[in-house]
């Protein structure tokens, strides 16, 4: 239906989102990365594009970006995410402890 690119670091997606709203594709595949993800997801939701209405697949959302975006703006979307070390489960806590012991307390996971 369409393909559009934005410069790395872009935060204004109104034109692209308007095209999406007009064409109403079944699936939206976004390769937005970095801090641009925060603006992208918030602007999608503000435009009424949600996971309930369309399928959105995204390349990557990091743990920090997810916090900035807000869970309410990610509901219903699919992403290939990196490992989230803050996941609050016994198995994850055990893994993080073992990882930090082996690689150092400041070693990032994912």
State where each predicted segment sits:
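Extracellular/periplasmic Venus flytrap/periplasmic-binding protein
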Residues: 1-47, 85-94
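Extracellular/periplasmic periplasmic-binding protein-like sensory domains
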Residues: 44-110
